[in-house]
Every structure is written in C-alpha cells, then in structure tokens.
Curated annotation (Swiss-Prot):
Keywords: Ribonucleoprotein, Ribosomal protein, RNA-binding, rRNA-binding
Superkingdom of this protein's organism: Archaea
One matching Pfam family: Ribosomal_S3_C
Function: Binds the lower part of the 30S subunit head.
Keyword Chloroplast appears in the UniProt entry: no
Record InterPro entries: KH_dom, KH_dom-like_a/b, KH_dom_type_2, KH_sf_prok-type, Ribosomal_S3_C_sf, Ribosomal_uS3_arc, Ribosomal_uS3_C, Ribosomal_uS3_CS
PANTHER family with a match to the protein in the record: 30S/40S RIBOSOMAL PROTEIN S3, SMALL RIBOSOMAL SUBUNIT PROTEIN US3
Domain KH type-2: 16-85
Protein name per the record: Small ribosomal subunit protein uS3
Protein family membership: Belongs to the universal ribosomal protein uS3 family.
Amino acid sequence: MIERTFVGENVSETLIDEYFKTKLVRAGYSHIDLKKTPIGTRITVFAEKPGFVIGRKGKMVKELTETLSTEYAVNNPQIEVKQVESPDLDPAIVGHKIASSLERGMHFRKTAHSAIRRVMGSGAKGVSIIVSGKLSGERSRTEKFMDGYMKHCGEPAEALVNKSHQLAKLKLGVVGVTVKIMKPDVSLPDEITILSGEIKEVTEYSEASQE
C-alpha cells in the first residue's frame, strides 16, 4: 500500500511538472518542489521570470491553483514562486531556450554553440548538449556539443550533473534536446573526463528513422 502511494505521488508530480512546463513557457519554467503539509500541499515553482507565473493581479497563479485542485486532485494547493538566480546554469531553462530557437528556425549548431558559451560564461565546470532528430533532412541524427569537465556515467554523474530533456516541434518532426550541466560549486572526484577548450561535435545517424 505504501509503495502504491509512493508511485502514485511520483506520477502526479510528473504530470503537474508537464502541465507547468507547457503553461509557463514565457516564464522560463525550471521545475517544482512539491511538499504535503497538514493543511494542504505546498508547491514551489522555480522560474526565470516569476512575474509571468503570478500574472497580472495574480490571475495566472489563481488559474494554476484552480487547475491543480480540480484536474489534478491536489489537496488545498498553495503556490509559492521563486526566481532562478542563474538561469544559464539551469539545464531546463537552457534546454527550453534551445528548443524555442529551433522552433523559430535557428540553425541547431549556432544555437548550441551560443548556449554553451552562455553556460560556460556563467562559471559552469562543464556542459553537454545533445540534439537528436531530423535536423536538416529526412534522416535522423544525433549531434553532441561539449565543453569543460563532464562525468557521463556512474554515481558521480548522478550526483554532480544536472540534466534536463526538452522537445522542439519542427516541420520535419520532433527534435529532442538534452542538456547536462556541471555547476561551479560541485566537488569533482578524481575520475573525471577532461575535454578540450574547444566545442566538439559528434554526429550519429539512425538507420531505423529513415522513411
């Protein structure tokens, strides 16, 4: 019974996160922190632009609160909004900006290089951007861009690297954007991957995606 409750809560939080992700596009939405209290449910929304989450005269936050209560069965939702202090070190925000640029017709290489410069310029120890899908033709491929230090697998990768996955809807199809960032304040273990100061690109083609 406890396991079912735990799984149910995780599913609900995931659904709420997806709802906020689509509803708060202009706010630079990052993530939520959901905690149950004796008097209800406290939901902290982290975003680049808190004003867009609140809305004019609190209209948006009221709409969010009502939707959480009626459509997601959240008990007495109390929404708190916090600003992301370093948006260029937040993988969700960085990934969303890349996806938005791709949807506006920007070239994926130029967009990825620009994002990497912003991330590293904000003091990150390392960054990895993976763009996957039909980028410029009928054949799907994966492009990888990296700079700085990055741990790709194992427990250190889980503990030290923040990761986010976003989607861009293009004319040729949906493109996935994965961003990994190692922030300035992490303590690096001895086993690390050292990359050169230049951004590297790796192309991988998927034969199964040909149509």
